[in-house]
């Protein structure tokens, strides 16, 4: 029973990290950048109430299909030229961040988990 609770806690933490950490930029691969707010163009509620992100966010099972094809997100750029601009960042207006080279071990991933850029922090 205890091990089951531990597994459930780990799963909850993993899913929370998946939904909460945005601004993902994989340095030009698949042109992916969700700018921290997961398509705010279509769901403006994210800009003021980020807690609703997990509710409206597209189902995780489709992520490997959506991301390579519709990788650009909301307001801003996907990865660019192998370096990866972070797009327009927070809510489409503020921090951009820059993908830099390699991966960021201190930010939580999206699906591909390389070249992450969490709006300029911990690059």
UniProtKB/Swiss-Prot annotation:
* The keyword 4Fe-4S appears for this protein: no
Tissue pattern of expression reads: Prismatic layer of shell (at protein level). Expressed primarily in the mantle with highest level in the mantle edge and lower level in the mantle pallium.
Q: What would be one Gene Ontology cellular-component term for the protein?
A: extracellular region
Q: Which UniProt keywords apply?
A: Secreted, Signal
Task: Give the residue range of the signal peptide.
Answer: 1-16
- Where does this one sit in the cell? Secreted
What is the role of the protein in this entry?
May be involved in calcification of the prismatic layer of the shell.
Protein name, UniProt field:
Prismalin-14
Which organism was this protein described from?
Answer: Margaritifera margaritifera
């Amino acid at each position: 029973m205890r091990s089951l609770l531990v597994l459930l806690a780990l799963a909850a933490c993993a899913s929370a990290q998946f939904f909460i950490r945005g601004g993902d930029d994989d340095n030009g691969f698949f042109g992916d950048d969700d700018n921290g707010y997961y398509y705010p163009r279509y769901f403006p509620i994210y800009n003021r109430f980020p807690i609703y992100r997990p509710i409206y966010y597209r189902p995780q099972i489709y992520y490997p299909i959506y991301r390579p094809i519709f990788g650009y997100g909301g307001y801003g750029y996907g990865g660019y030229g192998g370096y990866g601009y972070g797009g327009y960042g927070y809510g489409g207006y503020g921090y951009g961040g820059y993908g830099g080279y390699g991966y960021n071990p201190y930010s939580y991933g999206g699906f591909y988990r390389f070249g992450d850029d969490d709006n300029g922090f911990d690059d």
